[in-house]
Structures are given as structure tokens and as C-alpha cells.
């Protein structure tokens, strides 16, 4: 039986992304360096705690504050849901790491793998939708017109469509996720049919293309086209005023995109390395792999800080809701 394990020496988890720098789908349960064995669960725990607190605050504000019910904020709400879902299951990663074996059943294995893949794909998919929305809004503003059909209900339908697409994309991972005994320890792994090497490479390429290359290319095309079209336009005074009013929202979306790329680009670049080289499994390579995986996890807890620092209306509504709750 062929498998790609989520276990040591790569990031030890049932739900994490495929090991960042793994150059084969085999795994061993070699002892980890002591500093790494301590640092990894601590980092995961911090990401979990900060992510749960921050995303809970975002969900609370966006769901409770009437003035926050905008199209852009609806997409941000969906990002927060994906991040919250991932941080909720991150303790299972920690348990798997500390025990060095999968302590739960096969159904939970499939579920956790699927949730992690939701985290891998959903962020950039929703950011692609948000970038398309910004493209339409900024262009329409520059031309002193409204975007036809841009309503909260339409945004809800688009969000559901994105979740549906992501579900189809992550389904193969849930299908291949199984329990397997490796060196006497039960592990949550991806069990591939023969030929093993082909399926392993296909899974990495699948994630690279659908989870990074296509959405990032789409986003780059959207913003490049937008800048070119705006450069060729002359804005009247009314359009300039509207453009200034929309500038903060656009900046927030771009900031979220930048942080997402910062967190996920190393992971996807490591896929290219894994597909094209055969790295020795040295302590340094293992440590880098854990760092890259932790960086991708960190994306789930950073967005709330962007909203707090860059969105004055978010801060204001959060304070008002906290004040009202305290007064009650």
C-alpha cells in the first residue's frame, strides 16, 4: 500500500498541508531535535489561540453590526469562517505531533484533511473574488457609474458558489485520506494507488496549479488591467471624490492579499522544489519545512489584525458592541 504521510520528519499533523519540502511520499518516524520538538507545538498553540480570538471577534462584528453588512465584508466574513474552522481543528495537529501517531478514527482523519485543504484553497479563492469585485467597483467609480447587480444577495450567491468549488477541489484529498500503520504507529496518510510516484507528484502539482498559480495569475491580471485602464482615464471631480471614498476598502483588500501571499508563497514554492529536486532529509531541511508550514498556518490568525489596524469602521463597531454588551 502506497502512502504520503503527514508524519515525521515533516510537519507532524493529520490536517496540515503536504510536507513543505518533502521530495517523496515516504515517511519515517525519526527522533526530532529537542528544540524543534518543543517549538512546533508552542507555535501551533499560539496560532490557534490568536486565530480563535481574532476570528471570533471578526465574526462577532460582521454578524452583529448592521453597518458592516457590505459586499466586501461578506467576503471577509467567509475568509474568517474558513480561518476559524481551521484554528478550531489545529489542536488535533498538536495532539498528533505530541503523540507521534493518529489518536482518532479514519472518519476524523478524512474530515481534518478536508478542513485543512479548505484552508489551503479558500483564502486565495475568496481573495480572487474580492479582487474581481474591487476591479468592477473601482472601474465603475472612475466612469461615474454603479456596478449592475452588485448586491448583498448576489455576493451571498457568489460566496456559496466559491464554497461549492472549493468542496469539489478538496474532495480527492478526503477520498485518499486513510489510516495506515507505519513502523507500528497509526498515521493519518494519503493512500495513493500505483504508480505511487506519479500520484504523489500529481497531488503536489494539483495543489500548486489550482491552489496558487491560477488564482494568483487571475489576481495579477485583474490589478494590472485595472491600473492600465485607470492610467488611460481622466477622472472628473465627482469620480475623484468617489475614488477617494473607495480607496481605503481597496487598500484593505490589497493588504489582505499581500499577507496571504507572504504566508502561502513559500509553501507553494517549496512544492516546486519538491517536484524538481531530491533534498536530503537533514535537520536544517526539516526545520525549514516546519517553518514554512507554520507560516502558512499563521495566515489564519493575521487577517483580524489587518482589519483592526486598517479599518476604522471595524474598530468603531467592535468598541460599540463591547460597550453595549458590558452595559447590558
Curated annotation (Swiss-Prot):
InterPro entries linked: GPCR_Rhodpsn, GPCR_Rhodpsn_7TM, Neuropept_B/W_rcpt
Compartments, as annotated in UniProt: Cell membrane
Topological region Cytoplasmic: 62-72, 133-157, 225-248, 299-328
Glycosylation sites: 3, 13, 25
GO terms for cellular component: membrane; neuron projection; plasma membrane; synapse
Organ and tissue specificity: Found in cerebellum and frontal cortex. Detected at high levels in hippocampus, amygdala and trachea; at moderate levels in fetal brain, pituitary gland and prostate. Not in caudate, accumbens, kidney or liver. Also detected at high levels in lung carcinoma.
GO molecular function: G protein-coupled opioid receptor activity; G protein-coupled receptor activity; neuropeptide binding; neuropeptide receptor activity
Protein purpose: Interacts specifically with a number of opioid ligands. Receptor for neuropeptides B and W, which may be involved in neuroendocrine system regulation, food intake and the organization of other signals. Has a higher affinity for neuropeptide B.
Protein's UniProt name: Neuropeptides B/W receptor type 1
Residues on Extracellular side: 1-37, 98-112, 178-202, 274-283
Amino acid at each position: 500500500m502506497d502512502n504520503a504521510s503527514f508524519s515525521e520528519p515533516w510537519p507532524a499533523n493529520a490536517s496540515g498541508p503536504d510536507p513543505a519540502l518533502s521530495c517523496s511520499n515516504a515517511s519515517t518516524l525519526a527522533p526530532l531535535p529537542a528544540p524543534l520538538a518543543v517549538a512546533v507545538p508552542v507555535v501551533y498553540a499560539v496560532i490557534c489561540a490568536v486565530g480563535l480570538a481574532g476570528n471570533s471577534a471578526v465574526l462577532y462584528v460582521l454578524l452583529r453590526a448592521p453597518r458592516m453588512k457590505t459586499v466586501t465584508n461578506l467576503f471577509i466574513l467567509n475568509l474568517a469562517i474558513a480561518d476559524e474552522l481551521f484554528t478550531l481543528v489545529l489542536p488535533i495537529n498538536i495532539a498528533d505531533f505530541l503523540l507521534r501517531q493518529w489518536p482518532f478514527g479514519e472518519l476524523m482523519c478524512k474530515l481534518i484533511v478536508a478542513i485543512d485543504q479548505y484552508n489551503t484553497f479558500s483564502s486565495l479563492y475568496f481573495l480572487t473574488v474580492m479582487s474581481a469585485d474591487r476591479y468592477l467597483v473601482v472601474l465603475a467609480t472612475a466612469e461615474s457609474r454603479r456596478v449592475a447587480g452588485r448586491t448583498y444577495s448576489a455576493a451571498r450567491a457568489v460566496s456559496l458558489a466559491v464554497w461549492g468549488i472549493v468542496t469539489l477541489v478538496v474532495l480527492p484529498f478526503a477520498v485518499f485520506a486513510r489510516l495506515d500503520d507505519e513502523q507500528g504507529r497509526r498515521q493519518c496518510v494519503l493512500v495513493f494507488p500505483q504508480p505511487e510516484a506519479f500520484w504523489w507528484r500529481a497531488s503536489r502539482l494539483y495543489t500548486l496549479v489550482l491552489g496558487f498559480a491560477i488564482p494568483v495569475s487571475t489576481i495579477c491580471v485583474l490589478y494590472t488591467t485595472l491600473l492600465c485602464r485607470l492610467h488611460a482615464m481622466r477622472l472628473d471631480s465627482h469620480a475623484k471624490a468617489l475614488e477617494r471614498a473607495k480607496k481605503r476598502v481597496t487598500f484593505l483588500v490589497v493588504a489582505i492579499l499581500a499577507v496571504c501571499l507572504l504566508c502561502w508563497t513559500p509553501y507553494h514554492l517549496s512544492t516546486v522544489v519538491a517536484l524538481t529536486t531530491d533534498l536530503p532529509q537533514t535537520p536544517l531541511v526539516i526545520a525549514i519545512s516546519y517553518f514554512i508550514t507554520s507560516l502558512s498556518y499563521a495566515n489564519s490568525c493575521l487577517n483580524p489584525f489587518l482589519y483592526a489596524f486598517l479599518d476604522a469602521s471595524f474598530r468603531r463597531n467592535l468598541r460599540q458592541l463591547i460597550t453595549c454588551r458590558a452595559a447590558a
